From Swiss-Prot:
PROSITE patterns: RIBOSOMAL_S16. NCBIfam families: S16. It comes from Fervidobacterium nodosum (strain ATCC 35602 / DSM 5306 / Rt17-B1). GO terms for molecular function: structural constituent of ribosome. This is Small ribosomal subunit protein bS16. InterPro entries: Ribosomal_bS16 (IPR000307), Ribosomal_bS16_CS (IPR020592), Ribosomal_bS16_dom_sf (IPR023803). Keywords: Ribonucleoprotein, Ribosomal protein. Transmembrane segments: none annotated. One of its GO terms (biological process) is translation. HAMAP family: Ribosomal_bS16. Belongs to the bacterial ribosomal protein bS16 family. The lineage of its organism: Bacteria, Thermotogati, Thermotogota, Thermotogae, Thermotogales. SUPFAM superfamilies: Ribosomal protein S16. Disulfide bonds: none annotated. One of its GO terms (cellular component) is small ribosomal subunit.
Length: 90
């Protein structure tokens, strides 16, 4: 199964994360299929940048977001765009 999840970047005690599409069986920081954006929890307020159109496309293909990524994408309005895309497709 393909998942949309975080992969850790940055140095010790200064993490930031890439939001990536990856096979579920790969390691956390292993090879990924595509990078969709990034999440920086150290900025105030935290910084998230995601290519929403590509994320919707991957979710329509069956990619499942992790719990954390699901919350981040929900705050960016991904699920509204996903519903629009599903209604256009039907």
């Amino acid at each position: 199964m393909v998942r949309i999840r975080l992969t850790r970047m940055g140095k010790k005690k200064q993490p930031f994360y890439r939001i990536v599409v990856v096979d579920q069986k790969k390691k956390r920081d292993g090879a990924y299929v595509e990078s969709l954006g990034y999440y920086n929890p150290l900025k105030e307020p935290y910084e998230v940048k995601v290519d929403i159109d590509r994320a919707v496309e991957w979710m329509l293909k069956g990619a499942q977001p992790s719990e954390t990524v699901s919350k981040l994408l929900g705050k960016l309005g991904l699920y509204e765009k996903l519903e629009e895309a599903k209604s256009k497709k039907a």
